[in-house]
Structure formats: structure tokens, C-alpha cells
């Protein structure tokens, strides 16, 4: 659902309703048509048939995945294509375990910042359940003071965390990721001299999503794995978790590679499991979500279909529209300009399309892309392992962008 197009349609409908009402007041009594009047009546113009969106084939996808993997020195690539609210194609290339286990569409990777989309979907579920107010001060959920001392009258909210405008200082310290430490930082010590919620305060913030995940857990009084699992993952047949060791089929976990060497081993991932205490820690909400490209594509398909998957409404259209709603001021970051949504991004003119919603992710040699076209409902999710990390003109990792170009504009 394109937020701006929806607003335009609503305005047009209101205008048409107004015109219709005025027409009823001013219309004269009906007059019988004369032969000359009937002859002057123009014939209705046929509605033009829209040009069909080009569709990539399995063979073309396999070729694009293999070519991109080779072009960018990857250890492995997965890709999944969305069409009409469903995942219709999947492809895999390379090694899940170097020189011994071939990558398959079923293997699971830690998908870095694509995790933030999963956190956003968790927020959408709680929004539908009436358990959160995105505009309420975080103190509502933490039960203690949350205040930026530089701007005490501007609340720090779930919405500011989703849009990277919370004004919290980013932190990679493991100790800062504990709920007790986050509570202290939220009381005042963890903020920058930036106005919460102001687009000028935008700064990509992993720590903010750690705090967001803990906040959602406190609101639900459940671990986020349970919130997302019961609300979406289980109904959609997705075996995924915010911690690698919490997936059911751990035999499908694949190590991450960077520079030809293992950067995150399976044994390390197995040590990360869900903590049952809500708000205890936020270690995995910025980048720990673990799944296959096809499984994440199911979640992207849900968004592209306004919350419906295989005929079942799992999210309200209003909750999806909230995630897709852009801030008014565009953001320029790493040589690309986009509209920050919640937490999706929207960029016009990507890969030959009018515009795409998307998110990228990178860590430990993983480079990924989630994207979909709100006008056509098609999209693509790409996971890569061990590739070089150059970016294209849209700020997307070039290996992912090469596959996206092939999907959105197949020859």
C-alpha cells in the first residue's frame, strides 16, 4: 500500500462525493432525448489494458543468482521472489559450509539489520492488539522516567525508535544492552542534544532497536519471539527466531563468512537462545533474526498484500499502512536519498519501478535486501554470504541490487 497514493485516492473520493451532492441540488428535471441529442452523445472510451509487469522465470532467477554470486565473490546466495502476496520462486547458489555442504533455499542465516523489519512487524501485531500506542512516552512501558534532558517536553516514543529519531546515543557495549542498563540510559544519561522525533535528528541507530525490542516485550509481557511467533511465524509456517539457537531446525543453520574465513560459527549461534524474561536484554533485536530468504520473503509478501497471507488476514491494513508511512522529510545517507518509514524505507525510481519499500542489512559478511513494489505487489528478498560489500546508486549492496534489477526488470 503506497501511503501517498492512498491519501490521494481518499481526497479524490471526498471531492467526487462533494461534487455529486452539489449536482443533485442543481440538476434540472429530466428532458426526453431528441434524435439529434442522442447522436451527439459521445461513445465511452474503452479503458486501456494495463501493460503486464514482466515476470522472471526460475531459470532466469537461477542465472541471476549465480551471476551475482560470481561477480561479487560470494560464498553463497539465496533469493526469493514474491508475486501476488506469495513466494513463488526460490533459488540458492554456492556453499552453506565451504567446500562441503551446498547452500539450499532451506538454510538459515543471521540476517543482520533485516531483523528490524521483524521487530517492526512485532510492533504492528501489538498495535492491532491495542497493547501499544506508538506516540506514548516510553515511560508507559518501562514504569520509570524516560526523558531526553536537552528536550524534556518532547517525548521519546516507539515511533521515534522505529524512525531512528529517538535521540538516543548509539552503543555497541554489551552491558548497555541489558534491560537494567537501558533503564538508566533512558532516564537521561543516554541521550544526545537532539530533538526526539525531528527528522533533522535522524541517525541510524542499532541501540535504538535493542531498546525498542525490550519496550515491546514489556508492553506485551512476553518475549518478542513469542509475540512474533504466535502472531505471524507459526500461522505462516516460518521456522525463525531472534536468536539462532531458538529455531527448531538448527541443523539448517549456516555459518557466516567474511574474507574467506568463518566470522560467526554455528556453534556460537547455537549458544544464543531466547530469554523468557520480558525486557531482560536487547542483544538480538538490531540484527539477530535468523531464517532463510524464502521465510523472510513470506513476511515481505504479507506486507505487500496489506496484511493478508494465503487468504488469512494476520495484520490489519491500518497496521501495515503505519509501517509504510514515510516521514515528510527525505533522508540522505551514504549517497542515497530515501523516505524513512517505520522502519521500512521508501525510495522512488529504484530498479525501473515507480518506487519500492525496502530494507538492507549487513554484518559478519552477510549482505541482504528485503524489497517490494506497493503498486504491483511483487518483490524480492536476497541473502548473501561472504561477498564484497560495495553499494549501488540506491545505497543497496551491489550483489543484492544486481539480483533485484533482474527480478524487477527481467529481459
Predicted regions located by residue number:
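C-terminal motif of bacterial Sec signal peptides marking the signal peptidase cleavage site
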Residues: 17-18
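Ser/Thr-rich, Proline-interspersed low-complexity disordered segments
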Residues: 21-55
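Short, conserved catalytic-motif segment at the N-terminal edge
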Residues: 56-109, 131, 191
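Active-site SXXK
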Residues: 65, 79, 85, 108-135, ...
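Short, glycine/proline-biased beta-turn/loop segments that scaffold the active-site neighborhood
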Residues: 133-150, 235-236
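Short, surface-exposed loop or secondary-structure junction motifs
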Residues: 150-362
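Short, well-ordered beta-strand elements
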Residues: 367-387
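Short, gly/Ser/Thr-rich active-site loops of penicillin-recognizing serine hydrolases
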Residues: 387-411
Amino acid at each position: 500500500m503506497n501511503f501517498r497514493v492512498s491519501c490521494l485516492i481518499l481526497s479524490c473520493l471526498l471531492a467526487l462525493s462533494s461534487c455529486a451532492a452539489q449536482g443533485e441540488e442543481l440538476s434540472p428535471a429530466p428532458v426526453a432525448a431528441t434524435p439529434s441529442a442522442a447522436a451527439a452523445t459521445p461513445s465511452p472510451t474503452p479503458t486501456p489494458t494495463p501493460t503486464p509487469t514482466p515476470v522472471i522465470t526460475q531459470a532466469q532467477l537461477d542465472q541471476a543468482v549465480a551471476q551475482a554470486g560470481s561477480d561479487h565473490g560470494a560464498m553463497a546466495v539465496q533469493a526469493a521472489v514474491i508475486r501476488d502476496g506469495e513466494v513463488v520462486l526460490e533459488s540458492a547458489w554456492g556453499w552453506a559450509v565451504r567446500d562441503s555442504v551446498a547452500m539450499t533455499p532451506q538454510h538459515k542465516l543471521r540476517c543482520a539489520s533485516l531483523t528490524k523489519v521483524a521487530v517492526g512487524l512485532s510492533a504492528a501485531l501489538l498495535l492491532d492488539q491495542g497493547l501499544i500506542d506508538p506516540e506514548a512516552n516510553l515511560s508507559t512501558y518501562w514504569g520509570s522516567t524516560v526523558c531526553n534532558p536537552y528536550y524534556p517536553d518532547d517525548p521519546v516514543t516507539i515511533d521515534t525508535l522505529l524512525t531512528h529519531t529517538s535521540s538516543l546515543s548509539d552503543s555497541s557495549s554489551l552491558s548497555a544492552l541489558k534491560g537494567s542498563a537501558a533503564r538508566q540510559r533512558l532516564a537521561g544519561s543516554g541521550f544526545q542534544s537532539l530533538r526526539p522525533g525531528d527528522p533533522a535528528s535522524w541517525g541510524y541507530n542499532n541501540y535504538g532497536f535493542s531498546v525498542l525490542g525490550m519496550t515491546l516485550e514489556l508492553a506485551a509481557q512476553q518475549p518478542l519471539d513469542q509475540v512474533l511467533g504466535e502472531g505471524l511465524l507459526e500461522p505462516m509456517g516460518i521456522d525463525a527466531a531472534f536468536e539462532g539457537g531458538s529455531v527448531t531446525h538448527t541443523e539448517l543453520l549456516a555459518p557466516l563468512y567474511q574474507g574467506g574465513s568463518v566470522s560467526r560459527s554455528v556453534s556460537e549461534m547455537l549458544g544464543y537462545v531466547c530469554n523468557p524474561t520480558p525486557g531482560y536484554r536487547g542483544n538480538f533485536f538490531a540484527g539477530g533474526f535468523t531464517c532463510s530468504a524464502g521465510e523472510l520473503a513470506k513476511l515481505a509478501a504479507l506486507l505487500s498484500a496489506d496484511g493478508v497471507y494465503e487468504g488469512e488476514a494476520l495484520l490489519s491494513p491500518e497496521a501495515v499502512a503505519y509501517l509504510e508511512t514515510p516521514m515528510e522529510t527525505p533522508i540522505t545517507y551514504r549517497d542515497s536519498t530515501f523516505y524513512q518509514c517505520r522502519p521500512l524505507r521508501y525510495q522512488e525510481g529504484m530498479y525501473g519501478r515507480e518506487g519500492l519499500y525496502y530494507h538492507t542489512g549487513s554484518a559478519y559478511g552477510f549482505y541482504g535486501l528485503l524489497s517490494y513494489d506497493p503498486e504491483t505487489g511483487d518483490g524480492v528478498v536476497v541473502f548473501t554470504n561472504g561477498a564484497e560489500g560495495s553499494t549501488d546508486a540506491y545505497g543497496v549492496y551491489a550483489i543484492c541490487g544486481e539480483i533485484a534489477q533482474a527480478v524487477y526488470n527481467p529481459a
